[in-house]
């Protein structure tokens, strides 16, 4: 019965792991719902300011903010939003694949790259992969604040204003639904004209107190809001991916336990049969 004892030990070990993954699944469900609420609360502001900025990009105001002016691309910047923890399936891996693909296109054109990394997984990836990381922040927690991001974002905005980078993009996972998280690379600056149907009209603006003061503040708020929205959406995507990963792990553990239980029963049956055969054989010999 040595084999049977070993199988029983494996079953007990897998059941213990199954309890952990089941608990982690339940925790991820709770955290995902809270993350979805934060995402839904911040999305209207992010979308509205993006719409206003789109109008400004299509308009021709008397003051053209540097964020609205295209220039030759010699160096680009990426704000990469990753998770702090693992056990979330291929969420980070798929994100890094999309980023590396976009970086490869730029490098083929001789464009250099600067990186601002949000999340421990992104920092670990670029330590191994290589890259010019100029700013990094991690451990934002379950309820990230825009104030925690301002310092890192400012590094990239200053680099753009000083001409050290010519384009800034944000790389993150979009929360489509519980089952789908889509890695995206979106250009933040210079602003791209919004292709909405309503923006085909000509827009004129009156600025108070003046265009420069208003746009200087609005453009910074725009970038900060888009990065913050990327962070909260990535957090919701992370919890959804972790929930699915833990559910799959729990289900797989159940299947493995069933298979091992069947093997155990067969081993036990074989041992009993062997014992009976030995008893019968001994009785016959007598």
Curated annotation (Swiss-Prot):
InterPro entries: ATP_synth_F1_ATPase_gsu (IPR035968), ATP_synth_F1_gsu (IPR000131), ATP_synth_F1_gsu_CS (IPR023632). SUPFAM superfamilies: ATP synthase (F1-ATPase), gamma subunit. Signal peptide: none annotated. Keywords: ATP synthesis, Cell inner membrane, Cell membrane, CF(1), Hydrogen ion transport, Ion transport, Membrane, Transport. One of its GO terms (cellular component) is proton-transporting ATP synthase complex. The keyword Zinc does not apply. One of its GO terms (biological process) is proton motive force-driven plasma membrane ATP synthesis. It is found in: Cell inner membrane. It is a peripheral membrane protein. GO terms for molecular function: ATP binding; proton-transporting ATP synthase activity, rotational mechanism. Belongs to the ATPase gamma chain family. Produces ATP from ADP in the presence of a proton gradient across the membrane. The gamma chain is believed to be important in regulating ATPase activity and the flow of protons through the CF(0) complex. F-type ATPases have 2 components, CF(1) - the catalytic core - and CF(0) - the membrane proton channel. CF(1) has five subunits: alpha(3), beta(3), gamma(1), delta(1), epsilon(1). CF(0) has three main subunits: a, b and c. This is ATP synthase gamma chain. It comes from Pseudomonas fluorescens (strain ATCC BAA-477 / NRRL B-23932 / Pf-5).
